[in-house]
Amino acid sequence: RTCFITPDVKSKPCPPGQEVCYTETWCDGFCGIRGKRVELGCAATCPTPKKTGIDIQCCSTDDCNTFPLRP
């Protein structure tokens, strides 16, 4: 599997056993100016948000976790 990985936002091979790509987004103090923070990566299973306000989307095809567009 290959997924986009931050901070480079480049497609890279995932480690063995990690077949899920994810896009994690959340707001910080600059959300109104810069938009949501974004983390892209690989995982063995879809991660669970650690706190409220974090949105995680998962997919399982190569490079499916593209950087989200600002609305």
From Swiss-Prot:
Q: Can you provide one Gene Ontology molecular function annotated for this UniProt record?
A: toxin activity
Signal peptide boundaries: none
**What is one Pfam family matched by this protein?**
Toxin_cobra-type
Q: Which SUPFAM superfamilies match?
A: Snake toxin-like
Q: List the keywords (alphabetical).
A: Acetylcholine receptor inhibiting toxin, Disulfide bond, Ion channel impairing toxin, Neurotoxin, Postsynaptic neurotoxin, Secreted, Toxin
Keyword Secreted belongs to the record: yes
Q: Where in the cell is it found?
A: Secreted
- Alphabetized Gene3D superfamilies for the sequence: CD59
Task: Keyword check for Hydrolase, yes or no.
Answer: no
InterPro entries named in the record: Snake_3FTx, Snake_toxin-like_sf, Snake_toxin_con_site, Toxin_cobra-type
Any S-S bridges, and between which cysteines? C3-C21, C14-C42, C27-C31, C46-C58, C59-C64
- Where is it mostly found? secreted
- Tissues in which the UniProt entry reports expression: Expressed by the venom gland.
Q: Which cellular component terms (GO) are annotated to the entry? A: extracellular region
The record's function comment reads: Binds with high affinity to muscular (alpha-1/CHRNA1) and neuronal (alpha-7/CHRNA7) nicotinic acetylcholine receptor (nAChR) and inhibits acetylcholine from binding to the receptor, thereby impairing neuromuscular and neuronal transmission.
Indicate the family of this protein.
Belongs to the three-finger toxin family. Long-chain subfamily. Type II alpha-neurotoxin sub-subfamily.
> What name does this protein carry?
Pseudonajatoxin b
Its lineage opens with:
Eukaryota, Metazoa, Chordata, Craniata, Vertebrata
